[in-house]
Amino acid sequence: MGSRKDFETLIPDKIRKKLRNDGVPFSELRQASKTPENLIEAIYRYWRGGNIRIERNWNGIPAEAKNVSYSNSACLLPDDRIYLENSTFRDLWKAATWNVNSIRTRLPLLLEWLEEQNPDVVCLQETKVEDAQFPAWELRQAGYESVCYGQKSYNGVAILSKHPIKDVQLGFHNCYDQDNARLIAATVSGVRLVNVYIPQGQTTESDKFKYKLTFIEELIQEILAENFSDSPLAIMGDFNIAPKAEDVSNPEAMQNKVSFHPEEHALLAKLTDFGLCDLFRKFDPRSGQFSWWDFRTQGFERGEGMRIDFILANTVLTSSCQACIIDTEARQQDRPSDHAPVIGEFKL
């Protein structure tokens, strides 16, 4: 993954100043670059990280002022004007959720991803580490304070933030499931965050499936206790449930299986019935957009996975959401998690 430093090494100082102030046409940027053959990819990666603004220009005729979204940086036009911004892209507040599947194993990837994406707050699941061994110092060096609720080798949740973390809660209000570190809540920038790692459930015949259903029932009560009607609230994390047919690669084969079972769907629907919105689906209705792929079957390479990681937001927060994506590039890196981050951008 690229970073701000990678991008800026391609740009002469005098051009960098223009990028921040007046913007630079892509053609001029390309001519001034020390290594123009690397520029397009660097622009794309830095744009994904949220610190480049691009205004479309058709042969010198500016289009309406707007930010250009594109999935392939090769479509940049010569007259497109590029701005390098000090603040987060469009001054938006960026929140992410990511099941890292062991924070100690994934720490180099996480630190690189934080530098590239520059999120304001991140909810992590499956940190798999006791609190004393949580890499708080390394994260602080990267600009993030953290609160964690962990245990040895299993489960574990944490919240990372560039802003003060307030009103931290470890576990459920009613002390349910105290032996498992699966829920942490806090307030950041006035937004109440509930970070949850719902049990996988194993098989529908097992006690672990009953535990999963009970856990979701308790989560519903926990959300009701938050009394969130007038202030922004996000429930973020690994839900281990694919809501609909478009969220799995083979819905027929998944029928009545764990993570795609009617009882799970009914409980998940109770959350949305409270007025919580699945933010990814607010912006992207396409099928085949997954956040988890099985290592054992090479699911990522085969395009076979499930969308089981969500940002659910109440009406107040949903109204401020400008975008929500699944960052599949993080899944393509060396030693990745089996999950990809889900990122939401908000105009608070």
For each feature predicted by the language model, list its residue ranges:
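Basic helix-extension-helix modules of the SAP/HeH family
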Residues: 1-67, 75
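N-terminal, active-site-proximal structural segment of metallo-dependent hydrolase catalytic domains
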Residues: 4, 16, 71-145, 152-157, ...
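Metal-dependent phosphoester-hydrolase catalytic domains
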Residues: 81, 131, 140, 168-175, ...
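Active-site beta-strand/loop signature of hydrolases that rely on acidic residues for catalysis
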Residues: 95-99, 114-132, 193, 223-245, ...
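Residue-level detector of structured alpha->beta connecting loops
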Residues: 118, 143, 164, 275-276
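Structured beta-strand-rich core segments of catalytic domains in phosphoester-bond hydrolases
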Residues: 127-130, 134-203
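Surface-exposed cleft-lining segments at the edges of enzyme active sites
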Residues: 173-174, 199-216, 252-257
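A long, amphipathic alpha-helix that forms part
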Residues: 209-230
